[in-house]
């Protein structure tokens, strides 16, 4: 990421860290070094607050001022008092947050190991989902069979990913 930022000083580089809490590495440490870096995070994934539309951006004072100058023109998801209170509470309860993220990561790794026993393969995941493929059974076939059993995964009929399923990690009970 630093290589991209350093070689593109004439543009704003936005790093979306929606899934960083699940094991990724944040670019926050680069903020003091690069004026053209904007790091954005959401409460939708690791804080399980997708419907609240809460997130934040970190960057130079100039970038943040520019965002503030246009936020009411382009932001159709302005925050109401309930969202602000719930977002604040989620930040203040760091113990619960860390326990929740750890549980999701542990469930993801357990599920991945179980699915590997069935022949599935996965690229490395640092998110709350797995991208799964089976060498002998087409993803579309698995998708349709799962849907018939009320198991909902995502299938993308697109080149390069049409033999993969996106499996969101739920509770241990749901994943069993």
Show the residue positions of the predicted features.
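Short acidic/glycine-enriched loop/turn segments that link adjacent beta-strands
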Residues: 51, 126, 160-163
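Short beta-strand-to-loop capping motifs
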Residues: 59, 132-136, 169-171
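Active-site pre-lysine segment of PLP-dependent enzymes
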Residues: 1-13, 17-49, 63
């Amino acid at each position: 990421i630093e290589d991209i930022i350093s070689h593109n000083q004439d543009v704003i580089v936005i790093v979306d860290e929606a899934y960083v809490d699940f094991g990724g590495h944040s670019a926050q440490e680069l903020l003091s070094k690069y004026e053209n870096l904007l790091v954005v995070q959401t409460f939708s994934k690791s804080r399980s607050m997708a419907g609240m539309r809460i997130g934040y951006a970190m960057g130079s004072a100039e970038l943040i001022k520019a965002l503030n100058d246009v936020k009411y023109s382009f932001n159709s998801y302005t925050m109401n008092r309930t969202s602000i209170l719930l977002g604040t509470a989620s930040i203040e309860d760091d113990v619960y947050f860390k326990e929740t993220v750890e549980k999701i990561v542990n469930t993801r790794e357990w599920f991945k190991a179980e699915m590997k026993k069935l022949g599935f393969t996965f690229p490395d995941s640092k998110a709350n989902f797995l991208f799964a493929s089976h060498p002998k059974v087409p993803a579309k076939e698995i998708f349709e069979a799962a849907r018939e059993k009320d198991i909902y995964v995502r299938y993308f009929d697109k080149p390069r990913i049409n033999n993969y399923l996106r499996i969101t990690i739920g509770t241990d009970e749901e994943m069993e």
